[in-house]
């Protein structure tokens, strides 16, 4: 045990899902942050922006976890096999995201989290990849998708972290980025051109469309880098 290590560790806020009156968070998110050397703190869903500001003031970084559909910046109509995000969650997530953006504290958006990060910056989202992207792969595990490859842009932060040009990732989404938000650029894509990772020009905001927390045997370096960034 090294108490001094944890005294110096960054505090990382993690958002949650919300269903049937309960906040839900998969343990793998906690595990990934702790293994990387960060102290995970679950952010409650609250309506008051003042309360959120007080709560998050001492945090060093933010992870926005996966979730259901987003209507912010939506292009097209949502299909029947995707659920909408609860208004309480989306409201709280947008507020906490805005607080971190204003302070330019490090942000890692995962799946829904990447889409929200992009939409908050004025970007657009496809409602249904398979209907709107010509030649699209099946990206939804609900529709039977498994793994697919992504091509990582050389020189990007993601490329520096992973050290490779191609990577096999899981895929659990029906929506995808249609148009990048202000300040963002794509750093990875699937074979059909669907954006799989984004980074902001300030170097502090990053999003991935896949779920690295469910592939920690090969994706832990992503969280390790995020924690180093939060120091």
Language-model features: locations:
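Short catalytic/ligand-gating loop segments at beta-alpha or beta-beta junctions
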Residues: 168-174, 198
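N-terminal beta1-alpha1 cap of cysteine-dependent amidohydrolase-like domains
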Residues: 1-108, 119-120, 126, 130-162, ...
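Short, conserved active-site loop motifs that form the nucleotide-linked donor/cofactor pocket
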Residues: 167, 184, 205
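Active-site-proximal beta-strand elements of phosphoester/diester hydrolases
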Residues: 206-210
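Active-site glycine-centered loops adjacent to acidic/histidine catalytic or metal-binding residues
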Residues: 111, 173, 211
